[in-house]
Amino acid sequence: RALGHRSLLINPMIKNAKDIINKVKKRESYRPFGASILKEHQKEYFGTDIHNPHMLYVGNTTKNNLDSITHIDGTCRYQTVDESNGVYYKLLRQFYRDTGCPLLLNTSFNINGKPILGNTQDTKLFFKESEIDVLVLGSDINISSQK
């Protein structure tokens, strides 16, 4: 699991978020995605307060506008994020402040059948050749000029 590291992230409220990520990852449309959620909001969204930092459990999705992370059985495999997650927590907290949504669709940064990208050169090449808008590598923020 990428768990916020070497991950592709997208706003789950975007109507076609799942289609966008499937196109980037070149994968089948039926495969589900997981989510990262601020720990303090997990009960509201998944009906449980079991700390789940490693995506070991699923929860019943309680919100109707999150089709991109809701599996066919009405559940989502999610990761709880708290202060111990450092920068990833700060990113998710700021996203919540900006949008009112305390979670992001989170999937591993790879394409179908390939391993997670493991070095800067391959990651930058993938970014250049894909439809990804923004790439964050450490403290470097790269914004696609094609968008």
Predicted regions and their residues:
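Flexible beta->alpha loop and helix N-cap segments adjacent to enzyme active/binding sites
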Residues: 1-147
